[in-house]
């Protein structure tokens, strides 16, 4: 893999005169327009780009201020911001449920830590590869997908990633509303009377709490990616302190912890489950492996990505695993039963004040996870689909509305939806990753003509055939079929936890064979058509 500097504006780009206002593009007809303003939509690059010779004509069907590359100068995501992103997402209630499930399946404390460590090591490497793509090009995931799949074919990976996210946005908001209901009833027991009826599957109190959290998230998104960055930065320490304190409280109550159960696995069965756990941990982050560039396009340097990933993935995951082991082991020591989530422990806190504090922290956590994992991806996917009509806020509002009207609480209660619809979509993520990562690192060797990602000229690099790269599709489809078969066909149940790896590996190998490896690729900076980053 070619080495590349932290940020890669071309020398000619650096010599361009800076705009009069550091956050204002050269737009004489829209002098008031800032990138962080959520309402106007800018369909053309800054006027200064017209003075740059050789730039292709930008299509308004492919470009607006949210899809445009970000300028190198002014990027705000530091190593701490990357770490805070992982501090929130790794410690999600769903992930704790997964880790606690490993305990219930027969793995002891040290085996769980080894399993998570294996998965974290793989993720650190893969997420660094994905993250470097973002800082090099400055583009979001739907635009990044144009490199391998074509300017129109990119809708396939963007919409698959967005569909998974928008459904989980609704489900995670519903799960957060359950925590809020517990909190409100603890403060005012009389509210329990509002929790017995059913309106479209949700009680009156359930509707009030869901809509409240829905509105809170929409308000945060109203102010763009920079507000999300700030929220994650503050939420991260709150989550770590709260969950660590919860683990200490449980350990104190139990006096010690059970590092294993009487029927813990040993020998080959134990090691199989260890590797299964590591593989599933990677699969959980299959979504982030695709669209991590949505965040790293605003990173200050490659060093900040590596540092943020190192503290946020291997070390933070081990801390997460230790907390999970203490919570599970202490609860098993106390009652002889397993817990499914830290929320189960919070409900047992005898002190109302401490219960309220813990419940609020879990709400902060769930919102933080939802914003980064399930809100950003569909926003960019929808913006890429309708760039002339949607920007970051409008797409965010549309995503939120979809997440509401699908009545996610009913979907969550349906095993068919969770296992087959979401599981099926998730099974497609590995093949997408295999094609995209192989094309960028092995075929093009990081040489990307960024301005041509925004032109629909038939002679452009990423137009392929009618805007779709048939070789990428030819590699993706068979790999996706194999991955889905491994995930769902009972015959392949012993290897089903590894379906992501099969899909990614087959797609990567197929694309490497099918792609044009002898073509000369050119590295052209997107700086002339970039807009200031306020993220």
Per-segment meaning from a language model:
Residues 160, 171, 177, 208-250, ...:
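Membrane-interface loop-to-helix entry segments
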Residues 173, 177-186, 237-263, 284-285, ...:
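Hydrophobic alpha-helical segments and their helix-loop junctions in multi-pass secondary transporters
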Residues 59-149, 153-156, 166, 287-314, ...:
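Transmembrane helix-boundary motif of multi-pass solute transporters/channels
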Residues 77-95, 209-216, 247-254, 263-327, ...:
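Hydrophobic, membrane-embedded alpha-helices of multi-pass small-molecule transporters
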